[in-house]
């Protein structure tokens, strides 16, 4: 959830910040996640296959995401998609029509509850596109990479915590 709050703080418009940021300070903040990864080999976050097509005062998103943490429980998604002028990120509320969460295929890192996400003609208001022309997609991806690194470090620590006593008892 904090990655989403950080992205909204850094790039969200005043309207987006007013609508979503205060909920992260509540006793029970919303479960929120970022969906960038796509299910293909050698995934490049700068060459997205998920598309967002402008349609009047909204965008229509189509595509698939993989390894989306907390996807089944998320109330708020930041979804990366390709638009005419390059990659963009959209704020999508959980339960939106056309947004489907798949089964949990993850082996090992079950604590993050990673699941695939399918977007089938998901309509999003144009005001839910992150940023006001100042959005830096590369920096957004870099922050997401840091989150993945912290997940990997935590997993390695859990392995050490488990293996140390096991080896000592053998």
Where are these regions (language model features)?
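Residue-level signal for inorganic ion chemistry
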Residues: 13, 79, 90, 119, ...
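A short core secondary-structure module
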Residues: 64-102
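A short, Trp-centered hydrophobic/proline-enriched beta-strand micro-motif
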Residues: 27-39
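Short, solvent-exposed loop/turn elements at beta->coil junctions and helix N-caps
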Residues: 37-41, 66-67, 104-107
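Internal helix-loop-helix
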Residues: 1-29, 68-76
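Glycine-rich beta->alpha junctions and the first turn(s) of the following alpha-helix
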Residues: 101-170
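A structural signal for short hydrophobic beta-strand segments in well-ordered beta-sheet cores
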Residues: 50-53
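Short glycine/proline-enriched turns and hinge-like loops at secondary-structure junctions
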Residues: 44-46, 70-74, 110-111
